[in-house]
């Protein structure tokens, strides 16, 4: 259900596009550096959006680096590393795990089960690191599955379960940055009045909720012929 949040490349300046690519490639490199090469396949454009949004409240400015990677061994690519990048990578791996779990349960796919064996230890580590996040995702996935099984005829009710997942993801991202002391805005900063942690957490949650509803509806439109 992910992969819908993409850039409009024609509307970006060259510098802006380079920053976006830096986040996208930075997440990929971050996953590979911390978890190995195979999990990098979980990367999606949505992760770059999440990282850029969260990084916008970080204290440290972007610091692009030029590095090689497995996919681009000859020409160096722009990479950006920060706490938001690491968090976005962690979230993509968690969502990939739950997608594999659903595939293995509903469709009995050998690929899903085999990949889960390879990702199981990573999932366990992430679950220890983000217990509340995992609990929230699991509860709402169960709610969504129950609604789909009951053939719920309310699109808003069904969409809300997925929207809640995105809300939790965005809120946990802000909490993670504060816990890592990545957000420290000086008293004279013009955004100081909006720098209250609870305000940022609630605002990020609203962004995530509305984005989640849009993603759910767009995905439903894409699959409408298959589901009718």
Language-model features: locations:
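Membrane-embedded alpha-helical segments that form the functional core of polytopic membrane enzymes
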Residues: 207-212
């Amino acid at each position: 259900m992910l992969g819908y949040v993409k850039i409009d490349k024609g509307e970006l300046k060259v510098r802006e596009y380079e920053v976006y690519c830096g986040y996208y490639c930075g997440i990929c490199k971050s996953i590979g550096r911390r978890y190995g090469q195979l999990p990098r396949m979980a990367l999606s454009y949505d992760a770059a959006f999440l990282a850029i949004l969260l990084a916008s409240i970080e204290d440290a400015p972007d610091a692009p680096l030029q590095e090689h990677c497995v996919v681009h061994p000859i020409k160096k690519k722009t990479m950006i590393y920060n706490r938001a990048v690491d968090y976005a990578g962690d979230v993509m791996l968690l969502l990939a795990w739950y997608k594999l779990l659903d595939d293995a349960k509903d469709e009995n796919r050998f690929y899903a089960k085999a990949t889960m064996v390879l990702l199981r230890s990573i999932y366990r580590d992430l679950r220890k690191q983000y217990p509340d996040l995992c609990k929230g995702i699991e509860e709402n996935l169960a709610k969504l599955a129950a609604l789909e099984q009951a053939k719920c005829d309310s699109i808003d009710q069904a969409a809300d379960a997925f929207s809640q997942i995105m809300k939790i993801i965005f809120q946990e991202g802000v909490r993670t940055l504060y816990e890592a002391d990545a957000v420290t805005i000086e008293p004279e900063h013009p955004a100081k009045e909006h720098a209250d942690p609870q305000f940022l957490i609630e605002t990020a949650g609203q962004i995530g909720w509305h984005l989640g509803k849009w993603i759910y509806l767009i995905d439903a439109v894409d699959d409408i012929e298959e589901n009718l």
